[in-house]
Regions:
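Conserved small/polar residues in nucleotide/adenosyl-binding loops
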Residues: 1-5
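Alpha-helical support elements that line or immediately flank enzyme active sites
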Residues: 22-35, 89
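Non-catalytic C-terminal accessory modules of carbohydrate-active enzymes
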Residues: 36-161
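Generic detection of short hydrophobic beta-strand segments and adjacent strand-loop junctions
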Residues: 163-165
Length: 165
């Protein structure tokens, strides 16, 4: 997604949007490595378009002006897109390389995830402590070539059977 498209979404939205739109916006922002924008979209979705029980009701339940719609049909796709948006913030592998914490908001200093799946039959776990990546664990279920963008600022150690770099 190019910057022009991202700016267009921000400029023309959200009058005709529903809650689902914010979940998908979070995915788009995460894919563009905009963690702050992704978190903002998810926050709006949760605060304005979810009922107290966590169900997604397409219209703006808070009447905050985040949508021109206020109706209450229950749908699941907004919640599923929300979960996808969080995962895209934590881990991405769609471009042929694995990126750990590619779209983390600036105020998320301590974050971890366990056993998220990446393309290529890889299972990834990672930790961020005080804003620095402290652990990345990748398990290959089928073998094959691992391409990982180095998330570490300094020295690191690779442990495992094959260590070709």
């Amino acid at each position: 997604m190019c910057i022009r498209d991202r700016n267009t979404l921000d400029k023309y939205g959200p009058g005709g949007w529903t809650g689902y739109s914010y979940s998908w916006l979070a995915n788009l922002k995460a894919r563009a490595f905009d963690g702050n924008g992704a978190a903002k979209a998810l926050r709006i979705f949760a605060e304005c378009f979810c009922l107290r029980n966590g169900f997604h009701a397409n219209g703006d339940q808070s009447r905050s002006g985040k949508s021109g719609f206020t109706y209450r049909p229950f749908t699941l796709e907004g919640n599923m897109a929300f979960a996808s948006g969080v995962q895209e913030m934590l881990l991405q592998s769609h471009s042929g390389v694995i990126r750990v914490f590619p779209a983390i908001p600036s105020d998320w200093k301590d974050v971890s995830f366990d056993k998220l799946r990446a393309i290529g039959a890889f299972v990834v776990s990672a930790s961020l402590e005080n804003g620095d990546v402290s652990l990345v664990k990748v398990v290959s279920e089928k073998g094959g070539l691992l391409r990982l963008v180095n998330p570490f600022k300094g020295k690191f150690r690779i442990a495992g059977k094959k260590k070709k770099i």
